[in-house]
Amino acid sequence: MAQGSRRRKVVLTAGAEGCSSSSGPDMEELLRCAERDLNIDARQLALAPGGTHVVALVSTRWLASLRERRLGPCPRAEGLGEAEVRTLLQRSVQRLPQGWTRVEVHGLRKRRLSYPLSRVLPFEEGSCSPETLTRFMQEVAAQNYRNLWRHAYHTYGQPYSHSTAPSAIPALDSIRQALQRVYGCTFLPVGESMQCLSNVRDGPSRGSSACPSLLRAEALLESPEMLYVVHPYVQFSLHDVVTFSPAKLTNSQAKVLFILFRVLRAMDACHRQGLACGALSLHHIAVDEKLCSELRLDLSAYEMPSEDENQEVSEEKDRTGVKSEKDGEGRPGCPTCQKELRGLVLDWVHGRVSNFYYLMQLNRLAGRRQGDPNYHPVLPWVVDFTTPYGRFRDLRKSKFRLNKGDKQLDFTYEMTRQAFVAGGAGSGEPLHVPHHISDVLSDITYYVYKARRTPRSVLCGHVRAQWEPHEYPATMERMQTWTPDECIPEFYTDPSIFCSIHPDMPDLDVPAWCSSNQEFVTAHRALLESWEVSQDLHHWIDLTFGYKLQGKEAVKEKNVCLHLVDAHTHLTSYGVVQLFDQPHPQRLAGAPALAPEPPLIPRLLVQPIQEATGQEDISGQLINGAGRHVVEVTPCESGWTRERPTAGEDDLEQATEALDSISIPGKAGDQPGSSSSQASPGLLPFSAPSGSRPGRRSKATGLDSGEGDEGKIVLPEGFSPIQALEELEKVGNFLARGLGSQLEEPEKPQAQPPVYLQSLFHRDMQVLGVLLAEMVFATRVRILQPDAPLWVRFEAVRGLCTRHSKDIPVSLQPVLDTLLQLSGPKSPLVVKKGKLDPLFEYRPVSQGLPPPSPAQLLSPFSSVVPFPTYFPALHKFILLYQARRVEDEVQGRELVFALWQQLGAVLNEITPEGLEILLPFVLSLMSEEHTAVYTAWYLFEPVAKALGPKNTIKYLLKPLIGAYENPCRLHGRFYLYTDCFVAQLVVRLGLQAFLIHLLPHVLQVLAGVEASQEEGKGLVGTTEDEENELPVPGPGSCAFGEEIQMGGQPAASSGLGLPDYRSGVSFHDQADLPDTEDFQAGLYVAESPQPQEAEAVSLGQLSDKSSTSEASQGEERGGDDGGAPVDKNSVKSGDSSQDLKQSEGSEEEEEEEEGCVVLEEEEQDEVTGTSELTLSDTILSMETVVAPGDGRDREEEEEPLPEQTEGKEQKILLDTACKMVRWLSAKLGPTVASRHVARNLLRLLTSCYVGPTRQQFTVSCDDSPPLNAGNIYQKRPVLGDIVSGPVLSCLLHIAHLYGEPVLTYQYLPYISYLVAPGSNSSPSRLNSRKEAGLLAAVTLTQKIIVYLSDTTLMDILPRISHEVLLPVLSFLTSFVTGFPSGAQARTVLCVKTISLIALICLRIGQEMVQQHLSEPVATFFQVFSHLHELRQQDLQLDLKGCTEGQLPEATFSDGQRRPVDPTLLEELQKVFTLEMAYTIYVPFSCLLGDIIRKIIPNHELVGELAGLYLESMSPSSLRNPASMEPVTPSAGPEWNPQSGSCLQDDGHSGTFGSVLVGNRIQIPDSQPQSSGPLGSISGVGSGGLSSRNEDNALKRELPRSAHGLSGNWLAYWQYEIGVSQQDAHFHFHQIRLQSFPGHTGAVKCVAALSSEDFFLSGSKDRTVRLWPLYNYGDGTSETAPRLIYAQHRKSVFYVGQLEAPQYVVSCDGAVHVWDPFTGKTLRTVDPSDSRVPLTAVAVMPAPHTSITMASSDSTLRFVDCRKPGLQHEFRLGGGLNPGLVRSLAVSPSGRSVVAGFSSGFMVLLDTRTGLVLRGWPAHEGDILQIKAVEGSVIVSSSSDHSLTVWKELEQKPTHHYKSASDPIHTFDLYGSEVVTGTVANKIGVCSLLEPPSQATTKLSSENFRGTLTSLALLPTKRHLLLGSDNGIIRLLA
């Protein structure tokens, strides 16, 4: 049984590919031995596609035991069928069942290693890499001397000396020892005998590999017959990269060189251990997504087959009979698998091999693998089966085109082309690349074809999940019509494919004209070999494998394949492969053009005989070279090609003999042909109908016209004299250009030389040269056989290198020349074809160097390979990354720290191409669970510094977001929230990008949302209208490093359509997704073009727009609420990884999804006593600034922290985050802090209350529960109050910083927005977000009331009443609006609302309550009456007249009829109980006194209910005042679940801070401490009516802050928070905000730092000053400089910042580089000639560190601040005299610099080449200033009063502005606008995009005195810095 399965596998993997390799028996032997020695089931073994090794499916446990040197039987894959196992062994399959993996088994036959191997070891060049130039030269000299001596000896001395043969050892022993040294482990004996025990007695059982660049070995095994090396499975090789993913290596020579570098390292290690690498190919270099390469040795090259074994192989091949059917029938000579493609093509063209065999060979060359569902061989469908033997298909069109039609393909191409243009080339989205065809044979089609033979489970997994057997095509006719893909070989060879193994699926029916499956297969095969197919098959080859796959021909034929044009960079092992780039020659199916006999020359006199002989015609059948019958074809005149001169007087006998000779079967002339009348131009004329007669001429032979011309020669119809030459040219052109082949020369027998190890090493180097050339000419060498001998590969690539030398990259030309001797002596190389011989002999000394070796090529002093200087450091970095296995956080930190120590050496010399190699490793570290935080902390700053802001945002933003959103709690997580790290983020990302994209994720930690992974999933899109605000899964939603394979789409990060770059980076791909598009769930979703606001960025994109009603309300409110207006598009623009499939109003789905919100919160609730305690201390430590002195009792009363690591970490984390937010709020200033920090915090506040768990009351650990602890009114905060503590703390700190207006102008409008009822939705519409928003609104209002002054409170009291209290009460008392969390949420809201109303009552007094709060109080109490009336009516509602969907109505005592939802009555009764009546009536009767009768009409009813509650209490309860405490939570300024942690001195907390008994207030003595944790939460409470600090409890003063808003600052802030973030225009209102006096001379230049918290100014007083930009005062205050730099000797005319190193550059004729933090001078650059001073300076943008300087002699110089001396020096003026350089500007990319001269001339220079791109007279006057903008735009101003906008390489300006009176001498840029300034003190704003129009404002003397000299704009803050000639700088808005 095992033998049969083995034989079956061999046939499937090797034979069915159309060729049985000569090593087939060898590989069968390897399969047999592996099964026996390794105990692996034969079903789980398969030959690798190249036939070099065996792939095995093994269990991970078996592999683990093998690594431990224990070899047991490998478990069988019991749960998998044979077909499934066969599929899992295919290369394109990446997903394996749990617990299974694949390995590679490489074997060496011991009997073939019996030859002796010379002991001569290589020279010492590889023993140690030369470290100095002297050492390198010494090594070279010594090797040259030895080589020359030995060469002379071998040439002249050895023939005459009778020396003994060199010492040698058996190759087996040498190889065994070398393998053990290389792989660091010993051989494990396996099999029946233990003969090899003696060879492994010493050495470690397992060690480290000699070189990490070598593919590691899992184990070395030895049996009596074999040596085995077991490798991990190689998923991708370099061959896959160059074949299927060539875009991964495009535009980067460094990547190719780095692969070569690592290969050389591996080869060097092997050579030093005495092991040759073998005949390597691209398949032997394993690569991963990061292009990290590892070398896999070719051990089979060591085997030397003997002659008797060769004979055995051929006999075995004959016995198996594979040749007759699989190798191609009737094929003469040796197996074509060993021939070069040239012979194969010629054999097919001349009919010596069958169509089937030839097509299978092409499939094999393309890498297609039998049985691989993604990459199975393809053959054409040739007929449609509708008629007997079918109608032939048009092979000039692809099957996809025939099925879909031209219109469909044109539409697909045009649509994808438009999307491609709109999205930008290289946008990374393959679906939007213009194409016609997606695939030639998809895996689904493959399984449909083989559905009858494939297990049901496989079909359900790949075709359709639900088993529908009758949905599969039932007949061959239906199959051919249905599929757009090509056919598979099984329909031509395998009759069993029609037979179904499924009982409910019928067999696949063959056409009616066939009686059996076998007959159909035979007929189908005959059709494939028919003459009709043969004559057009070359067209199909061109479409499938040839030149019509790419270029104009592909577009013309509608054959553009997606895989070939999408420029994908992910690795894949299948796709469409182009073999030929020239038209394929046609098969010569008719008579040859040059036959042995000449054609008949017809004359008038032989006409009767011709007619007679025509009757003797016999139809013949063509027998092609494969020995199969072809459809009937008859010969015609075009087949008669032999020409014999015949005179006009020749007799009839000669003509008759000629005619008779051509119709005799068996002669050369009997091959059929055809008339050329039906042949296409340029095709062979063999397509006439089979019924034509060869001897008969048509009437169109020209006889009529030539009857009178006796001597005229008339050629036969269709005969072309040059036809044979044309055919020869076509074939020759294809062979030369397409195949690069040449005439084969006879081999000369050569004696077998002895095998020297040194020769093997030379052979390795030659193999390396061949391999490099194959990588360069990957598209041209696909025509070579996969198992072509090395000498064939060498000759092919050497010819390519000679003919196409310009295609070789410059960096590889020297190494290819050295390795392959391309430019050697004129005498041709003698190529040796032995298996162990070098291809040729290297010269002893070539160009002064010895023969190449890995060590020589790796030497930094060798010029053969130009390896960059950073390669060794980068290689060391990657080795360290690969060597460490990180299993916990400690190891993760150690690894990152070690990498950080090495990173400096890498980045010092690295280039952008090197960063492309390094960056995927950094991104991988930032995406791994145990290293993400530490990678961000240690590596972000140096890597971002090298990348620059643009690339940092592109590549590092997504992993940064993932690190912040990752739910895992790590010890070092707080590092990400330190102010120093956030400062780095601001600097490296840019302030605007940080605020928009990253800040919302940073702030999430305050709300605790990041701690709940389940919540993050549950909040993803409960309804469609909530998708913009609920959390969406980002990198933190799944395990770190987990590849999301579903659909092949990388998980988009939250809020941003950011691609995943871990698989590769290319800086050349700069066409990113435009800002107007977002990548969402694989589709483009249109979005507003402005920068995405924080509202649309992740967490809940936690905005408050939780329903359609709220969104519409936001639109109505506009900017009034202090939040940005919500536009309808933004609701749909949130990035989500889920499809937009939730429908609006689907409350059932909403409830189900919200149910999973709080899975982790329940666990948090169980440890409330631990984690909340730590939270309390954190919150209070934050608030010590807000309320100084109030926390003095905290340390005394504080409980010791529980000894739980998680609690401590959470405390540290929140402490750090709150501290960072306080620092950031001050750093950003009032407007930016309000727009970005405060708004995000307000949104987060709502998320703190989402879900039922966060609405549960909590119990503090130090409380002994009262008697009624089970009561829902137990006085304790809800969990949401605990979670929201840090958020409230930060919100109040912002209010403390900037004053009371923050509370009234920003917080209160947002509260109104939260509680506003929806206008467009049904009254019952209340979701979990809205519910949480109500709780958050009431909680925040409690905080606000405490900190408001009396005057302010009275001013806004009507707003609070109408916009907060009444809307909340409308939800709370509604009979039709249900709460998602039921009675619990309504109870919490009720309790909080009572506390809020009571707090306001205490603040304003009884009279004001009656005047302003009577309506809210009455509304609240009225609900008791309504419920009482419904209870008295027995809940009988008026159901009459209620149509379906309408609610019944009830009539109440006030005469009004109101709708009532019967399902909500129970919920309301649970809330408004007797206890609730008692709880609210007693305190309000105390607070309101007698006016309660006027305000509350039903006070008597509520009083009765309260009395009933008192009566229901037991006497014991009445005696215990504590148990009678109403436990209504109340709002206070600060709260904490821990007793004594409150900011107030009072520790008591009753309903309102004390126990209320009857109508008096009683302070209980029995409770020295609060019995509940609400002491500091409860509003009124917290000592609200206590005897201590009563004023502080009800009212707190906001401490005065130096940054408090007043005057102009307040007016500007009020305006600014109402402006939409989507407004891209700059508005100048001339509001004076601050003054900066100090300079004693005119201010010449002003420049803001990138973080916008400081700015620099340079002046005539020879100083540069650094000023802070923090707000002070009311707009009239003056600010002193933070630092003064006074090292200049002249007037300073330029100051700027080098962004990458954060240095300041200033110039006064000499350039000074200094540190802005210390003022220390770092470098001074003086002009080379004092008579030629510097006139203009510009700094290069990050990541560049260069300074550009222009001198008065029109010379441009570049200086790198890190290195001494000049970098470059370019002359700008040329032959002209343009004057002095007045201004310089560098493009944002740093690729060009533009200089403006005093003559108005401008010059554009390429900084990379130094070439002048353009010079033009731009202005008529002096150039005053130039600035460069993104998009190759230049803006220049001149003394001719003009401001002009240019495109870099366009002649005419795009816009031209003219100032009427004064020139624009200074300007700055704001987005697409220019802000200008003139000497007349006028500020103007004009657009770069719209037609010329300018808004101008004259500066008033009150706001600005003096003359404007300089201007700078703060883009994020929207401020202007204006410098004047009096030395004062002013900040205006």
Swiss-Prot record:
Compositionally skewed regions (Basic and acidic residues) per UniProt: 314-330
MF terms (GO), sorted A to Z: K63-linked polyubiquitin modification-dependent protein binding; phosphatidylinositol 3-kinase inhibitor activity; phosphatidylinositol 3-kinase regulator activity
Localization per Swiss-Prot or TrEMBL: Early endosome membrane; Late endosome membrane; Lysosome membrane; Cytoplasmic vesicle, Autophagosome membrane
Skewed-composition ranges (Polar residues): 1100-1112, 1131-1140
Keywords from the named record: Cytoplasm, Cytoplasmic vesicle, Endosome, Lysosome, Membrane, Mitochondrion, Repeat, Transit peptide, WD repeat
Ranges where the record places region Necessary and sufficient for the interaction with SQSTM1: 1-643
Record's compositionally biased regions (Acidic residues): 1145-1166
Domain BEACH: 333-610
PANTHER family: WD REPEAT-CONTAINING PROTEIN 81
Family from the record: Belongs to the WD repeat WDR81 family.
Assembly with partners or alone: Interacts with WDR91; involved in early to late endosome cargo transport. Interacts with BECN1; negatively regulates the PI3 kinase/PI3K activity associated with endosomal membranes. Interacts with SQSTM1; the interaction is direct and regulates the interaction of SQSTM1 with ubiquitinated proteins. Interacts with MAP1LC3C; recruits MAP1LC3C to ubiquitinated protein aggregates in the aggrephagy process.
Entry function: Functions as a negative regulator of the PI3 kinase/PI3K activity associated with endosomal membranes via BECN1, a core subunit of the PI3K complex. By modifying the phosphatidylinositol 3-phosphate/PtdInsP3 content of endosomal membranes may regulate endosome fusion, recycling, sorting and early to late endosome transport. It is for instance, required for the delivery of cargos like BST2/tetherin from early to late endosome and thereby participates indirectly to their degradation by the lysosome.
UniProt name for this protein: WD repeat-containing protein 81
